[in-house]
Amino acid sequence: SPRFHSSNLKGPVPMGLSNWNGYIPQVIKLHPLEGDTRYGRAMEAIRQFYVPDAAGGARTSPHKAALPVYVMFVTDGSTSDKSATEKQLRWSSMEPIFWQFMGVGKGRKSKNKLLAAFQDSDFPFLESLDELPGRLIDHANYFAVHSPAEHSDAALYELLMPEYHGC
């Protein structure tokens, strides 16, 4: 499966049972965090990998696949390619791809009650994607957490799955 890190579309090797211990510090060491994130570029690459016939571009009719794709999209910032991101989300609504956006920081849809009380958000664009018009189906969800570590595995799983129905 493809892996993406910041604007690097190759990204780190997948995490598994054999390399989970110390995985995150090693990834950050090999792939330092950057100041630019292009959601649209990453979404296009994911679509090209899973549904190559569309070449990451527009689709005019629904596409079927043997298995749906669940994309967990984790970010701590906004994107520099908002228009491309919106196009990718609209086009991919014809494909069996579900996008779960998780903002790490402060958001209006924060699952931390203390943060939810704030009116401002680090993720207004992600919040708008969750309700983006012009899609065949609602195939995206968004939430924010101050830190994923503040939630148990079971609670985090519940946050990740409420709108996913297997496309």
Positions of PLM-derived features:
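Aromatic/pi-system hotspot detector in well-structured domains
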Residues: 1-2, 51, 90-94
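Conserved beta-strand elements of beta-rich interaction domains across eukaryotes
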Residues: 2, 78-79, 106-107, 147-150
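VWA/integrin I-like adhesion module and closely mimicked acidic/polar interface patches used
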Residues: 78-132
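Von Willebrand factor
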Residues: 1-16, 18-68, 71-72, 79-81, 102, 105-115, 119-121
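C-terminal helix of von Willebrand factor
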Residues: 131-167
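MIDAS-like acidic motif and immediate structural context at the N-terminus
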Residues: 74-76
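Residue-level recognition of the N-termini of beta-strands and the immediately preceding loop/turn
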Residues: 67-70, 97-98, 138-141
